[in-house]
Regions:
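Beta-rich catalytic cores
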Residues: 46
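Alpha-helix C-cap/termination motif
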Residues: 23, 57, 88-89
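A short acidic/basic microdomain associated with nuclease active sites
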Residues: 24-43
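Ordered hydrophobic segments in well-structured contexts
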Residues: 27-28, 34, 49-53, 62-64, ...
Length: 160
């Protein structure tokens, strides 16, 4: 199964999100979403491959997945770069690929998904994303939510 179509972008992301059921119930998802409200000409990354908003025990978590559906193995440098980029807006970050170099598994906080299956290889650890970045991505995926998204750092109820 392929997860990237050159003419379309990300495809079949639902199979990857199913692997992440440990994060709770999937309540919204999206693909090819801008994950930064502001970006400059030097920024080469501002569109995320796949996102899922999960809810467990009244807590919503935004999960970002960068998909590398290519033959070459993913390097630790690529893994760290995407963790930093997605980590600005996501509670959990995963890298999905067919092959990983050995050092990728030691990148702290990053989760790994094998595209062969797909299968969860390593669970991600919770990050502390910027609240505005988190809200920006969630509102693109689920603009019809009646209230502002619940976030781990939220202290008061916010209206529409």
């Amino acid at each position: 199964m392929r997860f990237v179509d050159p003419g379309v972008g990300t495809v079949n992301e639902g199979y990857l999100l199913e692997v992440l059921s440990e994060h709770g119930t999937l309540i919204a998802s999206g693909r090819e979403i801008c994950y930064r409200k502001e970006f400059g000409p030097q920024d080469d990354r501002f569109i995320g491959d796949a996102f899922g908003l999960f809810e467990a025990d009244g807590l919503r978590s935004l999960v970002g997945i960068e998909i590398k559906d290519w033959a070459a193995p993913v390097t630790p440098k690529i893994a760290r770069d995407y963790l930093e980029t997605y980590g600005r807006s996501c509670d959990f970050v995963y890298l999905a690929a067919r092959r990983f170099l050995p050092g990728v598994a030691s990148v702290r906080n990053l989760g790994l998904i094998s595209l062969e299956g797909p299968k969860l290889k390593k669970a991600a650890n919770r990050l502390s994303p910027d609240r505005a970045g988190w809200d920006f991505v969630v509102r693109q995926m689920a603009p019809d939510l009646a209230r502002a998204p619940l976030h781990p750092h939220q202290r008061r109820l916010m209206g529409p």
